[in-house]
Amino acid sequence: AGAATAITAADNGADVIVIERQPAATLRSNTRMSGGIFHCPDKSGNKAALKEYAKAMFSGENIPGKLEGEQPQVSDGLAEAWAEYTPGLLDWMKKQDPKFQAFATPGFKGAAFPTFPGAKDCGYQVYRSSYPDRIPAGFNTPCYNGPKEKAISGEAFWLCLDNGIKTRA
């Protein structure tokens, strides 16, 4: 989130600095160690349905065991932003590095909560980050600090964001 925020802030005229706690050679951020999976609904999906689905997720109203601390009053604005910006996320990532690729993840096809309002028509999709033309069979193929052209998962996601930061330095 910090890298994406820094990139967006820089693109909007802010002077930014990204400070990592760990040395670059041994950096093991959450993004880098993640599965590199990101949510990016299809642009052809129904935007109203996507907003309705996002509101259902963010409000907590449709989740059994809703916590008292959840604040449904903020979910409208969050759902509106989600519906507006997430369908363009894959394009935004490719702007950071044209070599970046992402593949639809069959195990995550469609909405995570299929019974929520808007789930059927929202075009929900989940992608997995990669630099190779295809992802190796093993989901946890090691690629930490390896060559960029072999990076997958969180390493690929992080390298893409890192490239976005470096091109603005």
PLM regions with names:
Residues 82-169:
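Conserved redox-cofactor binding core of oxidoreductases
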Residues 1-55, 122, 137, 142-169:
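Residues forming the flavin
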Residues 21-106, 113-114, 118-121:
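Redox-cofactor-proximal catalytic regions of oxidoreductases
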